[in-house]
């Protein structure tokens, strides 16, 4: 497959409380592609999408999500950082409450160390 769009977290750089990478990506994607097209796409993320991002993915109509580390593991990295007040609500549970069969793959233990290093650099600035 092809990489159609890429997005980083813009919460700090744009002072946007909903500027998580996945939500921001879905805003871009929904402006550029049809819902039918997006249903056949896969969103890849280093970490499991939070509840807000899972909602954006759901309403944006992406059919598959793949992530490296769980939201619980991300919480272990961020601790009580006010930038990441997270829910204990896996994206699978968010999607299960909806009407779409969004496929989810992750976490992947074989990439955990690499993903953790990326996030450590971000959260420990």
Region locations from a protein language model:
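A structural microfeature
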Residues: 4-7
